[in-house]
Amino acid sequence: MPRFTTLTPEQLEYVRTFFLMWGRLLIPKLVPGAHVVVASNPLLSYIVSGALADAGLERRGEIVRLTMTMRGGDRPKSAHEDFPEVSVMPRSMWEPWVVYRKPIEGRVQDNLRKWGTGGFRRPSRDKPFGDVILSAPTRATERRLAPHPSLKPQAFLRQLVRAVLPMGKGVVLDPFAGAGSTLAAAEAVGYKSIGVEKDEHFFDMACEAIPKLVQLTPDVNR
């Protein structure tokens, strides 16, 4: 939803209840130490995060997608000339992805040996995975292949998806697959993945778009 959308208390409670129930349903399907990463926005991330904590997952921080969008920064509606130096709210220049983990069994090293989970895969031995990822808006090339309203760029997703399987083994699950961009990123970095999408239109779009998105060579500096 647009970042500036104002939700009623009842709608906010619906969001909280949805992610609480979703988290509870998800936990039995996860191996110990598996990470859950959920894209959000600065206005709703606290609700999503609190619901996942209440569901029984443990908070492990946030991934910040550092990007400028077209949302926010506007002057007061119908009073632009009266308040030319005022922005109603900050223009969005980042996107929070909340990070949670199913509790591990014993120590991290024990969990890694048994389940292959519990941490994040480093970009290299000398460089840890960081919680800020520079990212340009999704390129027009990708949007033409997969015209989904919330399509994320491959340059960003491939870095994130690669990191969530610390041993490079396992299955990436996207329960809100949309046009398949996360699944394409998993395929591109050599991971197995499963996607779930209830919208038939977007399901068909994903079936067509995933092979094409996999073939893209994204600019990782974007």
Q: Where are the predicted features?
A:
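S-adenosyl-L-methionine-dependent nucleic acid methyltransferase catalytic domains
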Residues: M1-R222
